[in-house]
């Protein structure tokens, strides 16, 4: 497992199997997960100062991650 905080398996531990299944059968869900991971890693790089970003950009990334997480949660609960 990654050391990056907020990975989907950590955020939704009860849905790990369902996430795996949906990634294989639902292209939209797979794209949302890929985008979530990309944004989450960008936030982690900003937090760890590996990449310098403005406070506004980091805030925008956090809002984007939350929106993606909400969409993923909705699909997991469906």
Give residue ranges: language-model regions:
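Extended, charge-rich alpha-helical interface modules
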Residues: 1-78
